[in-house]
Amino acid sequence: MTQKDAAFHIERLLKFALKKGLIEELDVIPSRNALMDLFKIEKPYEGEVPEEELDTPSPILNKLLDYGVEIGLIEDTVTYRDLMDARIMGLLMPRESEVVRKFNEIASKDGIEKATEYFYELSKASNYIRMDRTSQNLYWRTPTEYGALEITINLSKPEKDPKEIEKAKKIPQSGYPKCLLCIENVGFAGNLNHPARQNLRIIPVKVAGEQWYFQYSPYVYYNEHCILLHEEHIPMKISEKTFVRLFDFIDQFPHYFMGSNADLPIVGGSILVHEHFQGGRHTFPMEEAPIEEYFIHPKYKEVKAGILKWPMSVIRLSSKDREKLTKLSSHILNVWKGYSDESVDVLAYSEKDGKIVPHNTITPIARFNKEGEYEIDLVLRNNRTTDKYPYGIFHPHEELHHIKKENIGLIEVMGLAVLPGRLKFELEEIRKILTGKEKFNKDMYDENHPLYKHLHWIEELIVKYGTHCTEEEAENYIKQEVGNKFLQVLLDAGVFKRDEKGKKAFEKFMETAGFKKLS
């Protein structure tokens, strides 16, 4: 690629940035100069630049990255290309203060919904949300007795090259930023161990009298998947304050739900070291789940309460009275934290090395329901392990690890499976077996083979469906069976099982918390 070609792609990118509102007319010349400096280009392209309708800058960025490789600016690996494309887009971004000013102006003039729309579009146009990757994720819905569960196979996090992994290990850790959620990520250039964030912008939001910040997730597992993060690097903690914060947020952003991962290992999310919530604009299967048993608490008669028909153990509370809802949520949390019932393997505490270890916590999700009431789902969690279940008693059991072994966090709890990218290839190979394109003999697979972990499952599928399916049949069967596995994952994670014994144990807990069952 010549310098002239690269200069042409810079003009395309400037047009894109102008069209998407990243820059204004007065910014074109300085932005051009900054990009020319980055790529060591001596003069701009002077020919005609055709009009384009692009949703993302990726097609243009890929050309400029190729040029960067050619001139020795970067190595040709996924990580170096990612570091460079964030750097390129960082040169086209409005400053943090400008974004916040515009967000607040739109919110006061046209309402918060329009403001989040602006910010979401900005996050996509800046390539912070890599829509070219997230659009590759596989997605389907699987009907079950609990409604249609949502399944995604996550292809948006590219695999790192083994050489890069080795190289990254040798880089000294600076400890700055402390984690991926710290506010110091805004504008950070990144390195082999930490993604570049020159194209990240965040919006300050006050909740519970504290300073928090609002941004979108770069991986958008669902529509307008957002993150609310504490200004300080403090660990996750579920307490009464959590409920105040969640309700404060939805008061300001009523079109979004907001939830928190649990604050204990195994049942929590992947980042426990930084207090944060996740929300967005998506109706999850759990939200549509009906209440199967109604309860009332004599001290909180203004609050409707019930147990959800859901594979995990969920108490739903709703009320117009936010204060009462907060107090009752806090009461349930405190009772649950100290609650044990050995008959169903629930122990609130254990002792390790002379220290008391807590096991019970909650995954809370707040929203406004269709009646305009505050609504909160409290998902009861327990992270105890035993010799029989070293990964967790209420965690996907080992026979499901071939599909999902990671923590069951907030997103999965609500009925959306985020499954590892390796499954795309593995499920395609299994489909070939069900259609007869590949012969199956379990002795063909040693433990290093990608299908080895699925052998027992493949045998079950062959018994059930045979090896003469059409392509379409095989695909549908596999999707249904993966959905069934995810349902089993959620059932494993539920503390009170869905059988008679589990239902009675759940009712006993509700009684302990002071609830009366409504017949």
From Swiss-Prot:
Its EC number is 2.7.7.12. Belongs to the galactose-1-phosphate uridylyltransferase type 2 family. PANTHER family: DUF4922 DOMAIN-CONTAINING PROTEIN, GALACTOSE-1-PHOSPHATE URIDYLYLTRANSFERASE. It comes from the Bacteria. Coiled coil: none annotated. Pathway: Carbohydrate metabolism; galactose metabolism. It catalyses: alpha-D-galactose 1-phosphate + UDP-alpha-D-glucose = alpha-D-glucose 1-phosphate + UDP-alpha-D-galactose. GO terms for biological process: galactose metabolic process. PROSITE patterns: GAL_P_UDP_TRANSF_II (PS01163). GO terms for cellular component: cytoplasm. It comes from Caldanaerobacter subterraneus subsp. tengcongensis (strain DSM 15242 / JCM 11007 / NBRC 100824 / MB4). The keyword Transcription does not apply. This is Galactose-1-phosphate uridylyltransferase. Keywords: Carbohydrate metabolism, Cytoplasm, Galactose metabolism, Nucleotidyltransferase, Transferase. One of its GO terms (molecular function) is UDP-glucose:hexose-1-phosphate uridylyltransferase activity. InterPro entries: GalP_uridyl_Trfase_II, GalP_uridyl_Trfase_II_CS, GalP_Utransf_C, GalP_Utransf_N. The gene is galT. Pfam families: GalP_UDP_tr_C (PF02744), GalP_UDP_transf (PF01087). It is found in: Cytoplasm.
